[in-house]
């Protein structure tokens, strides 16, 4: 009688172990978004009638999961300071993974621009941003500055 009880318990334990090993596991992917602000300003100084590019600012993105992939990337141009009639033509963003995108932009402050060329690329890295503008004045040296930020929407299972 005792061996029968031991055999039943043994088979019960084997059944439980079998179910534990064959049951599928559910793993949840991590997703999220994070905003990174440039530590300096993009600034341009132009002579009358001149067109040119601003200085480039760098934004280091770190702290995301190692396998984080971009699902959306936006650039907020930030606050603006200016003197004169400087008209923006475009904003350029590049990443350390080799992707670059030029976005048409007329210079609005705190404008959110959505990129498309960074989708499915690695999120961690260094991003550089600059803008191109034209001095519409025919008389004076003019300036314009912005302090941009980027928001990275990411997923670690793409």
PLM feature spans:
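Extracellular acidic, Ser/Thr/Pro-rich low-complexity tracts
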Residues: 63, 79-81, 135
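Bacterial N-terminal signal peptides that target proteins for export
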Residues: 2-14
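Short beta-strands within extracellular/lumenal beta-sheet-rich domains
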Residues: 48-64, 110-115, 151
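Short, surface-exposed beta-strand/strand-loop-strand elements in extracellular ectodomains
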Residues: 83-101
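A short beta-strand element within beta-rich, extracytoplasmic domains
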Residues: 68-81
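Flexible, small-residue-rich N-terminal segments that precede or flank a structured functional core
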Residues: 30-57
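Sec-dependent signal peptide cleavage junction
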Residues: 9, 21-37
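Cysteine-clustered segments with highest specificity for TGF-beta superfamily mature ligands
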Residues: 95-158
């Amino acid at each position: 009688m005792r061996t029968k009880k031991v055999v039943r318990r043994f088979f019960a334990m084997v059944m439980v172990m079998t179910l534990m090993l064959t049951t599928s596991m559910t793993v949840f992917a991590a997703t999220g978004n994070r905003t990174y602000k440039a530590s300096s300003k993009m600034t341009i100084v132009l002579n009358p009638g001149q067109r040119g590019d601003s200085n480039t600012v760098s934004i280091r993105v770190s702290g995301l999961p190692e396998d984080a992939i971009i699902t959306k990337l936006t650039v907020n141009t930030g606050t603006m300071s200016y003197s004169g009639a400087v008209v923006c033509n475009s904003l350029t963003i590049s990443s350390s993974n080799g992707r670059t995108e030029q976005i048409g932009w007329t210079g609005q402050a705190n404008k959110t621009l959505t990129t498309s060329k960074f989708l499915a690329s690695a999120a961690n890295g260094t991003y550089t941003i600059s803008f191109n503008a034209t001095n519409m004045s025919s008389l004076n040296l003019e300036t314009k500055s912005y302090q941009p930020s980027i928001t990275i929407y990411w997923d670690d299972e793409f």
